[in-house]
Amino acid sequence: MKHLEEIVMEALMPASRNATQTAGRVVSGATAALLSGATAALLLLLCALLAAWSRSDKSSVPGPPFYMGIGPLLSYFRFIWTGIGTASNYYNERYGDIVRVWINGEETIILSRSSAVYQVLRKPQYTSRFGSKQGLRCIGMHERGIIFNNNIELWKKVRTYFAKALTGPGLQRTVAICVASTDSHLDQLEELTDLSGQVDILNLLRCTIVDISNQMFLRVPLNEKELLVKIQKYFEAWQTVLIRPDFLFKFEWMYKEHKEAAHELHEAMEILVEKKRKALEEAEKLDDADFATDLIFAQNHGELSAENVQQCILEMIIAAPDTMSISLFFMLMLLKQNPEVEQEILKELDTVIGDKKAENSNLQHLIIMESFINESLRYHPVVDFTMRKSLEDDVIEGYKVFKGTNIILNVGRMHKCEFFSKPNEFSLENFEKTVPNRFFQPFGSGPRSCVGKHISMVMMKAILATLLSRYTMCPRDGRTLNNIRKTNNLSQQLAEKDSELTMMFTPRRRQ
């Protein structure tokens, strides 16, 4: 067993700097230094108190030692300092595929063994997520919306509205909307091109996806770029406050910036929802209801509150721009790093689609592209873990898990398992044969799986098919996924300026 001094040094190693970057956003100027010291002192006090009442029996699950309450302090500090995703990978690497740690003094199990992950995903007793209640209240997610709503009855009710919008007729019109929006933004490419001919690819993808989300779920005029700024600030606030201790929210100066970021987006969404409400009141007839329409009618019938309607629409609009846009960016980078795969996909596009536009009828025949998307999600995912809480006692792989235990499903690490022929390489050979669900879970499964998993695949196919049919995209010289700085907190985020991640667009000539 390691000495305490070694554990402290490991916990304070600058392996990652998510927390340094997030801390700099909590406050500005002279306040930042004060906050750093105050946060450390408050965390020390919290863990000292937790050590006093924590049960004395030790868990049989492997993990760092308790050390009279110092272990939970160091464990929690690592999650805040390096980010949830980075810390989860560290502990799985160090202690194995089932690990016990502590977050905010609460016992937390990190799972990367496929059988254990699959067990948690399919059981209804793990439909709840964990996170700071005060932090979720700060950003409007506590018992609202769908993503971190832990009021299970209300979550089930709002999920039906999401499911309706993301399947059936909504899914059928996705391809046409994606193709038209991508083409429209490509036609205005000069607006995102600098003097050297480099295109701001991330802004192109984000603007396109916000437009697609608006056309599918809200359908009101909006300013994409202004909304994107607010969405990015909201996301930063979300991942910063998610696992902060509740008592820190007694000090307004510690979370004021994040509260204001959430308020800005909520205010913008309130204006958009009112535009939608007014349009519905003035419409002579409603031939084609959408997600926002159904929610507003539910509010009118007393089924949902105005706050919940607004949060649901907010989450539907923000869900894709910051995850799908980065996923597509990673895919474009992987294509240039694997030119033989790019040639296979282009050949398939020419054969299946040719000079036509992508449609529902031909999209399903893009088999190589689907394998490429799956392999990209396996090899370099944007979101590589999910958070749950046990609502009942259970046994996982022989280990006792008590009610209230936090669970982190490290699916990104699970996807590097021995089932795949080349688990640590990017290779389409990994999907040459059918992969059972228990080994590949990019969108989860079971009662709390991603409700948009089917539409996400359709959107990515349609956008990629349109982009690759018109242009060849080349990153700046020497840029690869390995040398681009990233953080991994709530999801993998690019830690470089958009201007440093531009690409050259060259019109494509078909063979």
Swiss-Prot record:
Required co-factor(s) are:
heme
**Substrates-to-products reaction catalysed:** testosterone + 3 reduced [NADPH--hemoprotein reductase] + 3 O2 = 17beta-estradiol + formate + 3 oxidized [NADPH--hemoprotein reductase] + 4 H2O + 4 H(+); androst-4-ene-3,17-dione + 3 reduced [NADPH--hemoprotein reductase] + 3 O2 = estrone + formate + 3 oxidized [NADPH--hemoprotein reductase] + 4 H2O + 4 H(+)
Q: In which tissues is it expressed?
A: Expressed in ovary. It is also found in the brain, but not in the spleen, head kidney, kidney or liver.
Q: Which residues cross the membrane?
A: none
- Keywords, ordered alphabetically: Heme, Iron, Lipid metabolism, Membrane, Metal-binding, Monooxygenase, Oxidoreductase
- Family assignment? Belongs to the cytochrome P450 family.
Name of protein: Aromatase
Species of provenance: Anguilla japonica (Japanese eel)
Identify the gene encoding this protein: cyp19a1
